[in-house]
């Protein structure tokens, strides 16, 4: 029986659906896999070494998780543990990544709004986070290719702050400065909530 640890934020639907999809796959191929959820607080409080120690104690075959690019993920391989990174901040070059078509998501958003007749577009996201950057790139490039007279604006927070932290006053000022009517794409649901709360 394969033992797989998940180190991710299970308050997000993406992580729960990822776990569900892997469980369904294991069932569909007739595999008996033991799937264990680990909170990110283990990594954040005690470091990646604590995750590795826990994985060794649990005799884990693999760890799928959100890792910082400063985490020494090669330590997993040295201990015979397969490691797969879930999109978090940046992709890894040394281990496989679970990722999505983020550029395409941005493109689809821009195409949808353009078909609705919008001429002013804006993007709200987080800078230096792979999924936010690629969604903005797809959104912006599609807007610019559709019509050079379309306007585009972006507000992207720095990643130095926690992903959930935002400046309400800055967001309100930016929203008020946008030409109306405006089509706004947020990089994720949390950022969309920020807009509706502002």
Task: Identify what each model region corresponds to.
Residues 1-62, 71-198:
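Bacterial carbohydrate/catabolite-sensing allosteric modules
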């Amino acid at each position: 029986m394969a033992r797989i640890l998940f180190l991710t934020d299970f308050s997000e639907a993406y992580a729960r659906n990822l776990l569900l999809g892997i469980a369904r796959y294991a069932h569909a191929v007739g595999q008996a896999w033991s799937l264990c959820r680990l909170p990110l607080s283990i990594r954040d409080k005690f470091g990646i070494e604590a995750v590795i120690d826990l994985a060794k104690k649990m005799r884990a075959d693999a760890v799928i998780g959100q890792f910082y690019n400063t985490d020494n993920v090669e330590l997993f391989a040295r201990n015979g543990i397969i490691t797969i990174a879930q999109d978090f901040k940046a992709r890894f070059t040394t281990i496989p990544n679970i990722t999505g078509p983020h550029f395409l998501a941005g493109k689809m958003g821009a195409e949808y709004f353009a078909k609705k007749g919008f001429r002013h577009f804006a993007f709200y996201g987080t800078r230096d986070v792979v999924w936010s950057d690629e969604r903005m790139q797809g959104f912006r490039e599609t807007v610019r290719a559709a019509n050079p007279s379309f306007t585009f604006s972006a507000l992207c927070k720095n990643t130095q702050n926690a992903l959930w932290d935002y400046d309400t006053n800055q967001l309100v000022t930016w929203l008020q400065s946008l030409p109306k009517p405006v089509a706004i794409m947020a990089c994720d649901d949390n950022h969309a909530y920020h807009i509706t709360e502002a």
